[in-house]
Amino acid sequence: MSGGRFDFDDGGAYCGGWEGGKAHGHGLCTGPKGQGEYSGSWNFGFEVAGVYTWPSGNTFEGYWSQGKRHGLGIETKGRWLYKGEWTHGFKGRYGIRQSSSSGAKYEGTWNNGLQDGYGTETYADGGTYQGQFTNGMRHGYGVRQSVPYGMAVVVRSPLRTSLSSLRSEHSNGTVAPDSPASPASDGPALPSPAIPRGGFALSLLANAEAAARAPKGGGLFQRGALLGKLRRAESRTSVGSQRSRVSFLKSDLSSGASDAASTASLGEAAEGADEAAPFEADIDATTTETYMGEWKNDKRSGFGVSERSSGLRYEGEWLDNLRHGYGCTTLPDGHREEGKYRHNVLVKDTKRRMLQLKSNKVRQKVEHSVEGAQRAAAIARQKAEIAASRTSHAKAKAEAAEQAALAANQESNIARTLARELAPDFYQPGPEYQKRRLLQEILENSESLLEPPDRGAGAAGLPQPPRESPQLHERETPRPEGGSPSPAGTPPQPKRPRPGVSKDGLLSPGAWNGEPSGEGSRSVTPSEGAGRRSPARPATERMAIEALQAPPAPSREPEVALYQGYHSYAVRTTPPEPPPFEDQPEPEVSGSESAPSSPATAPLQAPTLRGPEPARETPAKLEPKPIIPKAEPRAKARKTEARGLTKAGAKKKARKEAALAAEAEVEVEEVPNTILICMVILLNIGLAILFVHLLT
């Protein structure tokens, strides 16, 4: 057997034993352009046992066959280490993959480089999952066991603390940069809708988001009838109504975070808070949680049982980590909630109804779901036992892989020694790659030590101190987007105080004249025009405008509040009296001054009250009569002025009578509405009594 150095056209080189024109014996080979290095034993051009080093510093130590990793070996890839069997270049059949930084690992069976079959996942906080896997995801039956609540990892990213590498990892073993858990991401992690803890899916805080998303049952009083003012009230006396708005099993995170299902999301108002079950803040630090049942695509879906050591338990159907379907929830105080769930919200319960047949059907479906959940839990326990046996077998293969790695390192050392003897100037890049990797790890570790405690804990997935655990779900949960605009809407009122704006936000007489209200009325332009023309008006007209700005009578406030239900703004039923125009010298001036006042009042009047408007134009047409005779004596002028004054007084009385008639019409219109409401209510009560009588 001869040996020496051989340079290839692609930039690679080989230095070692040679026979029959192929590499044979021991030797060292570099890849194209000198990238990558293999050192070990050869068999007529194919690797047998040795060490392959990538430019990133990742290594494989083990056996090869036909140019692919095959047999036993150890792969070091970033912070992850795989020890076990290899089949034609892929991980499997049995092996262990673990993280050198967090301690998370998977032990079980593999297929095509992904977890497939049975295995055990151990998470960074110590929680475990034992069961079935398919294509790298939990799929089938399995058991998820958490650690005590005080020790559980606070998951601040949608990816799981242990398995983020299995489905969102680069080839060099680093977490994807778009992941919030990536240590290379700049700035603090974005707050998630909830602060979940590993393995805890049960929650006793109200879930406003799911309650708003779940449609409620419709009825006669919910279809917009009776002006939309009557709604079906929800009972607060039964267990179902008190607990239906409570989110027991909330998890709105991605599939990668399903093992760390979220607890309560946004909280709820104080309504019924004192009557609800114990809050999440009261959970004991030693409480644990277990889920046994079906998994689909890495999520709790199908039938399953989830229970806590404190006594909280749910048996029934699941969908995407949410209670969805029929099931039964048992609270720590012994109360039971049975019925149909939709997105964690109870939409149908088994309490006594008028239609007993319907409630019996719901109860039968609940019993069927509970039986299915119990069967699924029993199957999951059996699958967990099988996974435990596969785990022990994978551990044995991992120990054998360690021995194979030692043999591969020995072959690599022999090949390096031979290469130095044959060609002392031959460059061996493998040691340089490993040195770079060690320096990079040292730098990353030093940076992680210099990071603030809160950021380091969020990025590395380390558990938070137990003292913060009970209040994390309440204090660190961000407010909903709809609750923050209050600061933006309140400042305009103290900045522009108007005497015509009431505390209730209704328009007062000052606003009827065109003044802008605190809510941003559109009558800003007419009010400015009126203010510019006010100096040119006579004293009598200014006095009339000041009279309109007086505070309204207490008896007319209910009218404004009543018509606010029909319109998006407050409306006064009685139109404001226009200023007198008798003293105007010319009819053209009076017409031009009366025009700007109409746009300010038109948007604020009810549509039914436009009838009396033509009466306002009559004074402008009749005013020129006392002005035409200019050459007559003063006595005749006095007579005409007296006649004009009497006519003006009569017109004022006519306008007042028209306004009173309009008010009477509005009152008459109000009475049929109340009568109609009362009649419909009495009719419904009578029909209900008749229906119950027929059933009994």
From Swiss-Prot:
Placement of sequence motif Bipartite nuclear localization signal: 351-365
Amino acid composition bias (Low complexity), ranges on this chain: 176-189, 251-280, 587-603
Effect annotated for changing Y141H: In CMH17; results in vacuolization of intracellular structures and cardiomyocyte hypertrophy; affects intracellular calcium handling and homeostasis
Cytoplasmic side: 1-674
Alphabetized UniProt keyword annotations: Cardiomyopathy, Cell membrane, Developmental protein, Disease variant, DNA-binding, Endoplasmic reticulum, Membrane, Nucleus, Phosphoprotein, Repeat, Repressor, Sarcoplasmic reticulum, Transcription, Transcription regulation, Transmembrane, Transmembrane helix
Domain of life: Eukaryota
MORN-type repeats, residues: 14-36, 38-59, 60-79, 82-104, 106-128, 129-151, 291-313, 314-336
Compositionally biased spans, kind Basic and acidic residues: 470-479, 613-624, 631-644
GO biological process per UniProt: calcium ion homeostasis; calcium ion transport into cytosol; positive regulation of ryanodine-sensitive calcium-release channel activity; regulation of cardiac muscle contraction by calcium ion signaling; regulation of cardiac muscle tissue development; regulation of release of sequestered calcium ion into cytosol by sarcoplasmic reticulum
Pfam families: MORN (PF02493)
Residues the record lists as Phosphothreonine modifications: T477, T490
Disordered: annotated span: 164-193, 250-282, 448-652
GO molecular function: DNA binding; DNA-binding transcription repressor activity, RNA polymerase II-specific; phosphatidic acid binding; phosphatidylinositol-3,4,5-trisphosphate binding; phosphatidylinositol-3,5-bisphosphate binding; phosphatidylinositol-3-phosphate binding; phosphatidylinositol-4,5-bisphosphate binding; phosphatidylinositol-4-phosphate binding
Annotated site location: Cleavage: V155, R156, L204, L205, R572, T573
Tissues and organs where the protein is expressed, per its UniProt entry: Specifically expressed in skeletal muscle and heart.
Keyword NADP among record annotations: no
Domain topic, free-text comment: The MORN (membrane occupation and recognition nexus) repeats contribute to the plasma membrane binding, by interacting with phospholipids. Has affinity for phosphatidylserine, and phosphorylated phosphatidylinositols including PtdIns3P, PtdIns4P, PtdIns5P, PtdIns(3,5)P2 and PtdIns(3,4,5)P3.
Illness: Cardiomyopathy, familial hypertrophic, 17: A hereditary heart disorder characterized by ventricular hypertrophy, which is usually asymmetric and often involves the interventricular septum. The symptoms include dyspnea, syncope, collapse, palpitations, and chest pain. They can be readily provoked by exercise. The disorder has inter- and intrafamilial variability ranging from benign to malignant forms with high risk of cardiac failure and sudden cardiac death. Cardiomyopathy, dilated, 2E: A form of dilated cardiomyopathy, a disorder characterized by ventricular dilation and impaired systolic function, resulting in congestive heart failure and arrhythmia. Patients are at risk of premature death. CMD2E is an autosomal recessive form with neonatal or early childhood onset and rapid progression to cardiac failure.
Assembly and oligomerization: Interacts with TRPC3. Interacts with BAG5 and HSPA8; the interaction with HSPA8 is increased in the presence of BAG5.
PANTHER family, A to Z: GH28348P, JUNCTOPHILIN-2
Family membership noted in the UniProt record: Belongs to the junctophilin family.
Name of the protein this chain belongs to: Junctophilin-2
